[in-house]
A protein has these predicted regions:
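Catalytic loop of the DD-peptidase/beta-lactamase superfamily, centered on the K-T-G motif
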Residues: 4-141
Length: 141
């Protein structure tokens, strides 16, 4: 199956380091890679009039709706956590891959998640939503 924008390769460790760098506002292992304001700008909703993606049309490849989800620079951004009807934080940013892979970064909880699998299509089973619920249920104060 040939899917546009798929086929990127890397390691889960590298993906984790990338997420850690974004969580730390552009810094990793004491080295500044991106400016703090650049990361903040990437994670803002850039859709017109601060609309969510549902207002722009429903996603085809996702098992969850787009209500409360905006779009930043290269990633989806939670603009209203309650509207998403999932456990998440406003300001969280994330993206999923064609084979149900996913990452999310939640600055409020100081956490990131990288999930690798090969379940096609990603809309077949809500595995990412189940992972999200499980991850957030483990958080304690």
């Amino acid at each position: 199956m040939c899917i546009r924008d798929s086929g990127l390769t890397g390691t889960i460790g590298d993906y984790g380091r990338f997420c850690q760098m974004l969580l730390q506002k552009g810094e990793l292992d004491g080295t500044r890679i991106l400016g703090r304001k650049t990361v903040d700008f990437m994670a803002l909703n850039h859709l017109p009039d601060n609309k969510d993606m549902a207002a722009m049309g429903q996603p085809v490849w996702s098992e969850s709706s787009a209500e409360g989800i905006g779009y930043g620079l290269g990633m989806a951004v939670v603009i209203d956590a309650a509207t998403t009807q999932l456990l998440r934080s406003t300001g969280e940013y994330f993206w999923g891959g064609a084979a149900s892979t996913a990452f999310w970064i939640d600055p409020d909880e100081d956490m990131f998640v990288v999930f690798m699998t090969q379940l096609m299509p990603s809309s077949f089973y809500p595995i990412r939503n189940e992972l999200r619920v499980a991850a957030y249920q483990t958080l304690i104060d």
